[in-house]
C-alpha cells in the first residue's frame, strides 16, 4: 500500500525542475556515429560494418528511449507530435521524388490498375506501408544513374517502421512495465518464428512490416526499458554476462549462413536481431549520461549537433547523394592520364565519401529547414547548436 503514492508522484517530481530534460551527449554521439556508419555502409557495402556498429538498432533504441520519456504526457499528444516531426521531411522528399518519377513516365498504369497506384501513393503521405516508386527509370545522364528511384526509396522502410513503433509505443510501454522480460523477448521470438517458417503470411507488405518489427523491435523496447530504469534495476553483472552471449549467438548464426559481402546482417533478420540486441544492450549498460561534452570530444560538438539536428534529412537523402556522387566520380575514368597513373584513387571509396558528404551538406541547406518547421522552430539553414525551444503553455 505504501508504493502507490510513490509511483503516482514520481513523474511529477521528475518534471518539476524542468519540463524538458537536458540532452544526453552520449546519445547524441551514438546517433551521429550511427548516421555516419549508415552512409559509409551504403557507399561501400562492407559486410563487417554492421558488426562494428549496428546503426539501425542504435537508432531505434534511442528513438524508443525518447518516446518512453515523452509518454509521461498524454499518449495522443505525444504521437501527434512525433508524426508532426517525422512526416513533413518525408513529404518534401516525395514532392521532389514523385515529381521526378512522373516526369520520367511513371503513372497510374504502373501497378496494373490505376486504383492501386493512387491508393499506394497515399503511403507517401502517411507511410503505413512502404511508399511506391518507379523501377527502371533512365536517370539523368552524367548526373544521376539509372533506377534512381529505387535508391531514393531505399531508406523509407525506416520511416515506415518508425511510424508503427510510435503508434504502438503506448501499448508496448504498458506491456514493458507489466511483463518486461516477455515484452523484450517477443520481437526476437517472432524473428525465430519467421526464420524457421513457423509463421508465414501472404503478400509482401504485411510480412515486410512484421519482419522489420521482429528485427529491431527489441531494440526500440530496450530504449524504453533504459528510460524506465528497468535495466538499472538489474544486478550489475547481468548485462555484461548476458549481452555478449546473445550477440555471439547472432554472429554464429550469420557465419553458419554464409555471412559475407552481399549476404550480411541485412539479409539475415534473425542474426541482425540478436547481434543488434546484444550490442545495444551493452551500449545502454555503459551509458555515461553526459550532460556536457567530455574535453576530448568537445571539438566535435558542432558536427555532432548538426548530424542530430538534421538526422531525418540526412537519412532520407543520403542514398540519392551516394548515387549522384558515384555517377559524377565515374566521369574521371574518361581521363586516360588518371586511369593509367592513379587507378587506385579512382577505385577508392574515400574520395567518393567526401563528395557524398558535400552533397549531403547541400541537401541539409536545401531541405533541412523542413525539420525546423516540423518542430515548430525558426528555420535554420545550417544548425550550429541546439535550437531555442518554445515554452509550452
Language-model segments: residues:
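Alpha-helical transmembrane segments and their immediate juxtamembrane cytosolic regions
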Residues: 2-393
